A protein has these predicted regions:
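S-adenosyl-L-methionine-dependent methyltransferase catalytic module, highlighting the catalytic core
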Residues: 121, 129-221
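Conserved N-terminal segment of class I S-adenosyl-L-methionine
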Residues: 1-113, 119, 138, 211-214
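Hydrophobic adenine-recognition pocket in adenosine-nucleotide-binding enzymes
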Residues: 125
């Protein structure tokens, strides 16, 4: 497993502070991850799991919408931070009992029963692992969920955003190869930006450039 979990809570906290605190951070991330959120909603009726959830913003939002959500991460401090974000966000909404479970788990060893979830998803996670680990992770997610959605950076990813230090920016053709090796069949692909439409619209070059992030929707062969 490549990613060094000991600094992730600290990195996330710096991002939260830059955004002005828990609530502004969550609201900002929800806007930026709308394509991912919409894809999860498209393929899930009820039960979803986020693998390598980090601050868990997508999971927090999906639970608010009424989904039964499991968010897993390997680091205790990151889970604690995600719970804090959820608590502050849920104070602002009408849903009195969002169904979200935070669990400490290694995504290389999920341990759930077959088809426990409609969708297993991750975003900005797999690029921190080796080829063999990526294949293992996708295989496990295809076992526990009917549909798997993964978001990864493309070669158009801005290196200044590589704050975590060990991102592997692979060609999309190579990601397709790894997914096939894991026994997956790609049923949909979507490019994704993190910046808002209006912000890109006023930056001509960014608006027309290829997307820096890519989403794969995967099912078993």
């Amino acid at each position: 497993m490549k990613k060094n979990s000991s600094h992730w809570a600290e990195i996330y906290q710096k991002d939260i502070d830059k955004k002005g605190g828990n609530l502004p951070y969550v609201l900002n991330k929800i806007i930026k991850k709308k394509k991912l959120i919409n894809l999860v909603r498209k393929y899930s009726n009820k039960n979803v799991i986020e693998c390598g959830s980090g601050t868990s913003v997508v999971s927090i939002y999906l639970a608010m919408l009424g989904y039964n959500v499991t968010a897993i991460d390997i680091e205790d401090d990151v889970i604690k931070l995600a719970k804090s974000l959820a608590k502050d966000y849920y104070k602002t909404i009408d849903n009195p009992n969002p169904q979200i479970i935070f669990e400490k788990k290694n995504i290389l060893d999920l341990g759930y029963e077959k088809d426990s979830f409609d969708v297993a998803f991750s975003n900005g996670v797999l690029e921190h692992f080796s080829d063999d680990e990526i294949i293992q992770i996708i295989k496990q997610q295809l076992y526990v969920a009917k549909t798997v959605i993964v978001g990864i950076p493309t070669k158009y990813f801005d290196s200044s955003e590589a704050k975590y230090g060990n991102e592997r920016v692979l060609e999309l053709s190579y990601w397709r190869y790894l997914i096939k090796k894991a026994g997956g069949s790609i049923i949909e692909e979507i490019g994704m930006d993190r910046e808002s439409f209006l912000k890109r619209l006023f930056n001509y070059k960014k608006y027309f450039r290829p997307k820096p992030y890519h989403l794969f929707v995967i099912k078993n062969n």
